[in-house]
Each structure stands twice: as structure tokens, then as C-alpha cells.
């Protein structure tokens, strides 16, 4: 699975950069001018993937075992963990296959390798799309729980959540198959970028609106109990900080990846863009880091889920 150019494959060619890495250094571009390249050691990449794998397996197992967690909110959190698990697992699998092929340990026909390569690409792409969709679904679920609190349980029923989950998975797999099949069309990469921006805007609008409602609610409590204004100010700052961290992590971890795909469309031959393409594995590593952070933000803050995790780990059985 050698690198054939940044525009050759949606995820395949960009992800199949040479796996042998060295310390931080400068790589030459096509004219010999220096490019800053940040090599990611395979050991580090696989270790991060393993941490993500274990972490998200624990989340899925804890939610599956506890009936108290069988609600629409935890359904979306469980599916986010499952999609993050597949993101890290598929990237680990591809890296392992590349290493085995380069070492000569895995010897098979080129057609089999290509078929495996395409399958992993579809799995990686679909799990990434699912991860983004479930981040958006969690934001929508929380928005409804705040603005339609009295009707929340009638709106966000478990069957409806399950139908939404099924629709997301089916749409992601079908879209990924089309994206990988027609990887050489610029519209494919542009669609992915538009999808990322849509999710970013959706999350930003919903969470900002939720923050505004929370501040309004806090202000009402202050007036009711005649507390001092600094308490309200402190709440607003904490809420703004939480929102900044949540959206900042999302943009930092996913933004470079989709920016790289956009540059493949607009400047595939430009020297600066080619320097950016050389760091594609860094962008994938950021996504793996996001799959590690997601459970900390969305799952482990739940006291009930933490208690269930302690039971799962304490008993040593699923």
C-alpha cells in the first residue's frame, strides 16, 4: 500500500505514508525546499489506539450491563464510544498490516491486499462519520432536555433514539462506500468538509444557546435568593470555559484532518500543501486522541456510569 500521491486515495493514500519514522526533522519537498515534518512513531500511534480501544470498550460494556443506563442519552454515548472504538481499531489494523507487509511477515496477493485496504478504508471513513454524527446527536439530545424538559421523555424515547442510531450507521456506511469508490472526485472531499463544518456549526449553536439558558436560569436563582452578582459572573465564566474547551477540542482534533482533505482539492501540487500532506499521520493521531478524550467528556462524568465501571473492573467479568 505505497503512497501514490495525496490525491490518489481518500483515506488510503494519505494514511499510507511510509511507516518508518525518525525524530522531528525537516523533509524536502519536490523542489528540495525544507518542509517541517512531524513523524509519529508507530509504537506511539498503536499505543494511543490501544488506550482508546480499552477505554471505549469499557464504556460500551458498562452501558450495556446497566439497565439504568438504557436511555436515549446513553444510547448515543454508547454509540459514540463504539464508533470511536472502530476509528482507533481500524487505524491500528491498517498500521499493523502495513508493518507486517513491509517486514515480509504477511505475504499475499496484491488483489487481496487491495481488497483489505478498501475494506479498512470504508470502515475507517464510516466510523469517523458516525463519530461526528453522534457528537451532534448528543448535542441535540442535551438541547431538547434543557429547552423541552417537560416533554423530553416523550420526545426522546428509546425506540426513537434506536431508529436514529440505525439511520446514522446505515447512512455512514453507504456514504463511506460511495466516498471510497469515487475518491478521485473533488466533490467527495468537499462534501466531507461541508459535513464537518455543519457538525461544528450545529454543536456551536446548540451549546451556546444552552449556555445562554443556563446563565439566564442562574440569574433567576440569584434574584430569588438575593445573592451577590459575582456568583453569577463566576458561573458564566465557568460555563464559557467549559464550552470553549468542548468546542476547542473538537475543532483541534478534527479540523486539521478535514483541512488536509480540502487542500487536496484546491492545491494538490502546491509546495506548502505538499508539506502539510507529509504530516497527515499527525492529523490522524489527533483524531485518535479525540477518541480518548470523548469518554472523559461525555461518559465518565456520569456518576452512575463511573459506579458501573468500578463494578465491571472489580468483578473482572463482563
Swiss-Prot record:
<feature type="topological domain" description="Cytoplasmic">
    <location>
        <begin position="212"/>
        <end position="240"/>
    </location>
</feature>
<feature type="topological domain" description="Cytoplasmic">
    <location>
        <begin position="301"/>
        <end position="318"/>
    </location>
</feature>
<feature type="topological domain" description="Extracellular">
    <location>
        <begin position="184"/>
        <end position="191"/>
    </location>
</feature>
<keyword id="KW-0675">Receptor</keyword>
<feature type="glycosylation site" description="N-linked (GlcNAc...) asparagine">
    <location>
        <position position="29"/>
    </location>
</feature>
<comment type="similarity">
    <text>Belongs to the G-protein coupled receptor 1 family.</text>
</comment>
<dbReference type="InterPro" id="IPR000276">
    <property type="entry name" value="GPCR_Rhodpsn"/>
</dbReference>
<feature type="transmembrane region" description="Helical; Name=5">
    <location>
        <begin position="192"/>
        <end position="211"/>
    </location>
</feature>
<keyword id="KW-0472">Membrane</keyword>
<feature type="transmembrane region" description="Helical; Name=7">
    <location>
        <begin position="280"/>
        <end position="300"/>
    </location>
</feature>
<keyword id="KW-1133">Transmembrane helix</keyword>
<feature type="transmembrane region" description="Helical; Name=4">
    <location>
        <begin position="164"/>
        <end position="183"/>
    </location>
</feature>
<dbReference type="InterPro" id="IPR017452">
    <property type="entry name" value="GPCR_Rhodpsn_7TM"/>
</dbReference>
<dbReference type="GO" id="GO:0004980">
    <property type="term" value="F:melanocyte-stimulating hormone receptor activity"/>
</dbReference>
<dbReference type="InterPro" id="IPR001671">
    <property type="entry name" value="Melcrt_ACTH_rcpt"/>
</dbReference>
<feature type="topological domain" description="Extracellular">
    <location>
        <begin position="267"/>
        <end position="279"/>
    </location>
</feature>
<keyword id="KW-1003">Cell membrane</keyword>
<feature type="transmembrane region" description="Helical; Name=3">
    <location>
        <begin position="119"/>
        <end position="140"/>
    </location>
</feature>
<dbReference type="Pfam" id="PF00001">
    <property type="entry name" value="7tm_1"/>
</dbReference>
<feature type="topological domain" description="Extracellular">
    <location>
        <begin position="94"/>
        <end position="118"/>
    </location>
</feature>
<feature type="topological domain" description="Cytoplasmic">
    <location>
        <begin position="64"/>
        <end position="72"/>
    </location>
</feature>
<feature type="transmembrane region" description="Helical; Name=2">
    <location>
        <begin position="73"/>
        <end position="93"/>
    </location>
</feature>
<feature type="topological domain" description="Extracellular">
    <location>
        <begin position="1"/>
        <end position="37"/>
    </location>
</feature>
<feature type="transmembrane region" description="Helical; Name=6">
    <location>
        <begin position="241"/>
        <end position="266"/>
    </location>
</feature>
<feature type="topological domain" description="Cytoplasmic">
    <location>
        <begin position="141"/>
        <end position="163"/>
    </location>
</feature>
<comment type="subunit">
    <text>Interacts with MGRN1, but does not undergo MGRN1-mediated ubiquitination; this interaction competes with GNAS-binding and thus inhibits agonist-induced cAMP production. Interacts with OPN3; the interaction results in a decrease in MC1R-mediated cAMP signaling and ultimately a decrease in melanin production in melanocytes.</text>
</comment>
<keyword id="KW-0325">Glycoprotein</keyword>
<keyword id="KW-0807">Transducer</keyword>
<dbReference type="GO" id="GO:0005886">
    <property type="term" value="C:plasma membrane"/>
</dbReference>
<dbReference type="GO" id="GO:0007189">
    <property type="term" value="P:adenylate cyclase-activating G protein-coupled receptor signaling pathway"/>
</dbReference>
<keyword id="KW-0812">Transmembrane</keyword>
<comment type="function">
    <text>Receptor for MSH (alpha, beta and gamma) and ACTH. The activity of this receptor is mediated by G proteins which activate adenylate cyclase. Mediates melanogenesis, the production of eumelanin (black/brown) and phaeomelanin (red/yellow), via regulation of cAMP signaling in melanocytes.</text>
</comment>
<keyword id="KW-0297">G-protein coupled receptor</keyword>
<protein>
    <recommendedName>
        <fullName>Melanocyte-stimulating hormone receptor</fullName>
    </recommendedName>
</protein>
<dbReference type="InterPro" id="IPR000761">
    <property type="entry name" value="MSH_rcpt"/>
</dbReference>
<feature type="transmembrane region" description="Helical; Name=1">
    <location>
        <begin position="38"/>
        <end position="63"/>
    </location>
</feature>
Amino acid at each position: 500500500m505505497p503512497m501514490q500521491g495525496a490525491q490518489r486515495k481518500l483515506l488510503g493514500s494519505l494514511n499510507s505514508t511510509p511507516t518508518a519514522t525518525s525524530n522531528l526533522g525537516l523533509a524536502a519537498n519536490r523542489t528540495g525546499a525544507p518542509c517541517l515534518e512531524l513523524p509519529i512513531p508507530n509504537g506511539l500511534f498503536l499505543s494511543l489506539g490501544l488506550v482508546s480501544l480499552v477505554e471505549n470498550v469499557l464504556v460500551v460494556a458498562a452501558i450495556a450491563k446497566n439497565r439504568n443506563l438504557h436511555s436515549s442519552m446513553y444510547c448515543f454515548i454508547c454509540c459514540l464510544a463504539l464508533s470511536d472504538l472502530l476509528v482507533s481499531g481500524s487505524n491500528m489494523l491498517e498500521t499493523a498490516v502495513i508493518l507486517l507487509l513491509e517486514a515480509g511477515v504477511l505475504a499475499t496477493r496484491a488483489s487481496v491486499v487491495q481488497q483489505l485496504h478498501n475494506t479498512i478504508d470504508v470502515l475507517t471513513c464510516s466510523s469517523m462519520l458516525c463519530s461526528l454524527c453522534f457528537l451532534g446527536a448528543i448535542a441535540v439530545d442535551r438541547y431538547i432536555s434543557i429547552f423541552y424538559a417537560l416533554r423530553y421523555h416523550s420526545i426522546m424515547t428509546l425506540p426513537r433514539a434506536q431508529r436514529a442510531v440505525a439511520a446514522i450507521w446505515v447512512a455512514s456506511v453507504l456514504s463511506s462506500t460511495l466516498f471510497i469508490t469515487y475518491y478521485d472526485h473533488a466533490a467527495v472531499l468537499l462534501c466531507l468538509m461541508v459535513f464537518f463544518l455543519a457538525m461544528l456549526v450545529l454543536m456551536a449553536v446548540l451549546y451556546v444557546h444552552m449556555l445562554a439558558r443556563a446563565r439566564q436560569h442562574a440569574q433567576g436563582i440569584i434574584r430569588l435568593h438575593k445573592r451577590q452578582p459575582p456568583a453569577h459572573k463566576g458561573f458564566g465564566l465557568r460555563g464559557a470555559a467549559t464550552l470553549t474547551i468542548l468546542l476547542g477540542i473538537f475543532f483541534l482534533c478534527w479540523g486539521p484532518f478535514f483541512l488536509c482533505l480540502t487542500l487536496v482539492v484546491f492545491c494538490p501540487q502546491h509546495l506548502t500543501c505538499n508539506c502539510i500532506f507529509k504530516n497527515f499521520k499527525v492529523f490522524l493521531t489527533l483524531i485518535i486522541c479525540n477518541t480518548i478524550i470523548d469518554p472523559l467528556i461525555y461518559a465518565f462524568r456520569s456518576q452512575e456510569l463511573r459506579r458501573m465501571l468500578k463494578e465491571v473492573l472489580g468483578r473482572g467479568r463482563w
